[in-house]
């Protein structure tokens, strides 16, 4: 197995773990905040969606980087 292929796999795998965990924690805490204060649901939901989009951008960037590394290997 080529070490470059291993590096591409690790770049994608490890790069997606962080945003995945972050979005999970963000959703849990946002649901908890809405449960405690239902009047602020709109503001909390807006911030949650914005934060999830930014975190997902990092995951997509990692995925694209892995694809670029993989095509460079071939």
Regions found by a protein language model. Give the residues of each.
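Hydrophobic, small-residue-rich transmembrane alpha-helices and their short perimembrane loops
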Residues: 1-74
């Amino acid at each position: 197995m080529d070490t470059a292929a291993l590096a591409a796999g690790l770049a994608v795998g490890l790069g997606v773990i962080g945003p995945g965990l972050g979005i999970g924690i963000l959703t849990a805490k946002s649901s908890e905040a809405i449960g405690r204060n239902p009047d602020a649901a709109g503001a909390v939901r807006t911030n949650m969606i914005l934060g999830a989009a930014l975190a997902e951008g990092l995951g997509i960037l990692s995925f694209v980087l892995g694809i670029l590394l993989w095509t460079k290997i071939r």
